[in-house]
Amino acid sequence: MLVLGIESSCDETGLALYDTQRGLLAHALHSQIAMHRDYGGVVPELASRDHIRRALPLLEEVMAQSGTRRDDIDAIAFTQGPGLAGALLVGASIANALALAWNKPTVGIHHLEGHLLSPLLVDEPPPFPFVALLVSGGHTQLMRVTDVGVYETLGETLDDAAGEAFDKTAKLIGLGYPGGPEVSKLAETGTPGAVVLPRPMLHSGDLDFSFSGLKTAVLTQMKKFEAAKLDGEALERAKADLARGFVDAAVDVLVAKSLAALKKTKLKRLVVAGGVGANRQLRAALSAAAAKRGFDVHYPDLALCTDNGAMIALAGALRLGRWPEQANADYAFTVKPRWDLASLAG
């Protein structure tokens, strides 16, 4: 089965072709980072308009890359939610218009299911079941993944997502957009232990997260720098140490909770997905801690940690392979800006 995947939930337009026999044939992505940088965040209306401009050129690109003709495609998968309503509508409309013109069925995909399944795109994918750490700008969750469509929430953030905390910390420190990669880069130049920040809910006894207090601790520390009248090189060193303290605290919590989830479920495999899953400090800490305890950790390719069409095409192929009745051939569709992953069933 050959599936075209279309991702448009936020500020990346992604298209890809996935074949159940040959794997990922082609994927192309356009990021809107440069467009939103002047605003310090994603502007929904601009995001929607840009998806309209980018989708068809990206389609032509993946078709040319793979030598695929429209007659070769069996179905079209699109991100149905969650995400920005306007952005979702653009992707859904394009998917259904193509499907109508080409006489193909469609299937709507949960964006987070795409992330959960994205590590299956590697050459040696992890077998089910596994624990998944889904960590991104909008979500931080630990899930038990028994099979496609069989997901149990083990823990989740009670306030800010980890990626959101990274972005807000970057803004507090005075870094550019997008903040997550910038604060991580700065942290690598900081001195370990120079600034020690709290590890929220580290010993809470459950698998939930909280990152708002960590963000507040960063703000408090910045006020101390201001009161001390730090400037110039001294201020830059202090900011680097603060970034290091923040990243170390966030990573410690993510690692500890992930290991606790593996222990609770008695599973041996952890899958890490979502944009923050590309963070080098998190990958290194998780891999080291897991290896000491005999656990395996699986990551998607770095290029597939961000939102992308490949994960949507894969999820569509897996769903249609198991449940052909989910194929929609009447081209009526809805989008779901809010959509609980735990409610998703086969």
From Swiss-Prot:
Its EC number is 2.3.1.234. Substrate binds at L134, V135, S136, G137, G138, D167, G180, N279. Gene3D superfamilies: 3.30.420.40. This is tRNA N6-adenosine threonylcarbamoyltransferase. One of its GO terms (biological process) is tRNA threonylcarbamoyladenosine modification. Belongs to the KAE1 / TsaD family. It catalyses: L-threonylcarbamoyladenylate + adenosine(37) in tRNA = N(6)-L-threonylcarbamoyladenosine(37) in tRNA + AMP + H(+). InterPro entries: ATPase_NBD, Gcp-like_dom, KAE1/TsaD, TsaD. One of its GO terms (cellular component) is cytoplasm. The lineage of its organism: Bacteria, Pseudomonadati, Pseudomonadota, Betaproteobacteria, Burkholderiales. One of its GO terms (molecular function) is N(6)-L-threonylcarbamoyladenine synthase activity. It is found in: Cytoplasm.
